[in-house]
Amino acid sequence: MKPIRGLFGLTAAFFLLTISSHAVAKDRVTILYDAFSDNKAVTRDWGFSALVEHDGKRILFDTGNNPEIFEHNVKALNVDLTKIDFAVISHRHTDHATGLKYLLKIKPDVTVYVPADGDNGFGGSEFPQVFYRPEPSLPVKMRYFDGTYPEHLRSGKLYATGNFILVDKLTEVAPGIFLLYTVSKIPRTLELPELTLAIKGPHGLILVDGCSHSGIEEILQAASAVDPHPYIVFGGLHLVRTPVPEIDVLVDSLKNKWKLEKVAPGHCTGEPAFLRLQKAFGDDYLYAGAGTQIEIP
């Protein structure tokens, strides 16, 4: 009987060790894709992707610009995308969405949240009957559908596989995990909706942005419906072409108006903004190049 007790004890110890290892698992963000890095194992390219791990959920946010580079970086960082719970595509631009080709190859039925956008092609767009602007005086041969219009016109999908869910409002996709829906008000991008990942954390809201086409302050305003206290922002702030005086005003606003505690900027934030954010936030500026893994409390 002694060997049995010994085996039982060993098994129990292993079981407890397994539970313990899960209990201390850290919430974290791993940057999979960006144009800057200090990690020689990854390939740099313009675009953005991050793996977000929080409260047992694994979320892929954006997929980068090139499916081959995306695949390379994912494998170089030993990330298993078949184990993600769902994916989010922030907006339709190819430097955020092209890596879907690789994701859907290895996990074809994955749930992918995308912004409701008539031009994104992810879930297929739907246009109302009034879209046709009927002109009854035309001969039948010149009229769409011989003048007998379907009630709705549904466009095709760019991807044959994947479970695409269109989001057009603030949506809670898991307990404490939200998608913010904003639309750019900048001229020539008025039609561009964007999703931001917002997670309730013990110190405030954790935000992951793709490009912030809507403007980071517009996004923070939308986020206040979830939690008025933003803790940290990851990702692109779209300041790469913004004049320096405007960057200075925004950085001051992030720190003093919005009381943002930490920043981990990347992608289209731009080097002038990197510099000014680093000066303003000091030790609360977190380097977030491709291959970086940042723990979030």
Task: Describe each model-derived feature in a short phrase.
Residues 1-11:
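Bacterial N-terminal signal peptides that target proteins for export
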Residues 9-19:
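Bacterial N-terminal signal peptides
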Residues 23-25:
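Boundary at the C-terminal end of the N-terminal hydrophobic targeting segment
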Residues 28-77, 190-209:
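Conserved beta-strand hairpin/beta-sheet module of binuclear metal-dependent hydrolase folds
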Residues 38-39, 67-69, 93-98, 119-122, ...:
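Active-site environment of divalent metal-dependent phosphoester hydrolases
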Residues 68-113, 117-119, 224-234, 238, ...:
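Active-site metal-binding motif and surrounding structural segment of the metallo-beta-lactamase
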Residues 111, 196, 202-292:
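Cap/insert and terminal regions of metallo-dependent hydrolase folds
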Residues 118-195, 202, 286-297:
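Metallo-beta-lactamase
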